[in-house]
């Protein structure tokens, strides 16, 4: 199952896959931001995408313990940033309470 992070929590991630909803803060060096702060990627953005500073994307990252890779970008309308923040908050609450919102084995 792919995890969810924000710019503050991704800094402590070492392994696994995660998705972050964030704005492009800088292209060189690659940097993203959300309401928790900014995060400078340790890898380039996934290739094949046109982007401008201020664009909102869902960023998919893979961590293998020693490196990170941005494998996919999905552009989304800026109005969805608040919706994603609410979903992330609800997911974290469910995890804290020991509940799963989506089963990792669901088809």
Swiss-Prot record:
Expressed in the germline. It comes from the Eukaryota. GO terms for cellular component: nucleus. Disruption phenotype: Embryonic lethality in 40% of animals, reduced brood size and high incidence of males phenotypes. Presence of a mix of univalent and bivalent chromosomes during diakinesis, impaired double strand breaks and chiasma formation and defective chromosome segregation. Delayed double break strand repair with an accumulation of rad-51-positive foci in early/mid pachynema in meiotic prophase I during meiotic recombination. Signal peptide: none annotated. GO terms for biological process: chiasma assembly; DNA repair; DNA replication; positive regulation of brood size; positive regulation of embryonic development; positive regulation of meiotic chromosome separation; positive regulation of reciprocal meiotic recombination; protein localization to nucleus. It is found in: Nucleus. GO terms for molecular function: DNA binding. Keywords: DNA damage, DNA repair, DNA replication, DNA-binding, Nucleus. Belongs to the RMI2 family. Component of the RMI complex, containing at least top-3, rmh-1 and rmh-2. Component of the BTR double Holliday Junction dissolution complex composed of at least him-6, top-3, rmh-1 and rmif-2, which is involved in double strand break repair in the germline. Interacts with rmh-1; the interaction is direct and is required for mutual stability and localization at nuclear foci. Essential component of the RMI complex, a complex that plays an important role in the processing of homologous recombination intermediates. Component of the BTR double Holliday Junction dissolution complex, which is involved in homologous recombination during meiotic double strand break in the germline. Plays a role in double strand break repair by positively regulating the accumulation of rad-51 at double strand breaks. This is RecQ-mediated genome instability protein 2 homolog. The lineage of its organism: Eukaryota, Metazoa, Ecdysozoa, Nematoda, Chromadorea.
């Amino acid at each position: 199952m792919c995890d969810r992070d924000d710019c503050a929590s991704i800094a402590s991630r070492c392994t696994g896959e995660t998705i972050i909803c964030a704005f492009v803060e800088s292209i060189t060096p690659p940097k993203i931001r959300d309401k928790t702060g900014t995060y400078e990627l340790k890898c380039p953005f996934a290739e094949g995408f046109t982007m401008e500073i201020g664009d909102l994307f869902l960023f998919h990252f893979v961590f293998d313990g020693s490196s990170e890779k941005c494998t996919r970008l999905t552009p989304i309308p800026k109005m969805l940033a608040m919706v994603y923040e609410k979903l992330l908050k609800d997911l974290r609450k469910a995890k804290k309470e020991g509940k799963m919102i989506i089963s990792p084995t669901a088809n």
